[in-house]
Swiss-Prot record:
Functional note: Transferase that catalyzes the transfer of sulfur from thiosulfate to thiophilic acceptors such as cyanide or dithiols. May function in a CysM-independent thiosulfate assimilation pathway by catalyzing the conversion of thiosulfate to sulfite, which can then be used for L-cysteine biosynthesis.
Protein name as annotated: Thiosulfate sulfurtransferase GlpE
EC number(s) reported in the record: 2.8.1.1
Keyword field contains Cytoplasm: yes
């Protein structure tokens, strides 16, 4: 079984420029609606099964939370569901927002 990898904001920028990544944001809906990384999908318990059924398991998947803590557990869970290339964004949305403000 594979495990997730850590990803810096700079690495995420490079991946998104290459358009080779799926991004899931596990923050609450209000936080997501107030700001999120372009192209991110707001993943929650209600849409998790649908997402897993529709997602490309072979494409890199980046999990984003508030500060990079909760995303680690979610990233490991997604690895266990069959995703091959999963990352947790270090510093979470806060770090991404600071770097892109």
């Amino acid at each position: 079984m594979s495990s997730f990898k850590h990803l810096s904001v700079n690495q995420l920028v490079q991946m998104t420029e290459a358009k080779s990544v799926q991004i899931v944001d596990i923050r609450d809906g209000n936080s997501f609606n107030n700001g999120h990384i372009d192209g991110a999908f707001n993943l929650n318990n209600e849409n998790l099964a649908h997402f897993i059924g529709q997602a490309d398991m072979d494409r890199p998947l980046v999990v984003v939370c508030y500060h990079g803590i909760s995303s680690q557990n979610a990233a490991q869970y997604l690895c266990e569901q069959g995703f091959d290339d999963v990352y947790s964004l270090d510093g979470g949305f806060s770090a991404w927002h600071e770097a892109n403000a």
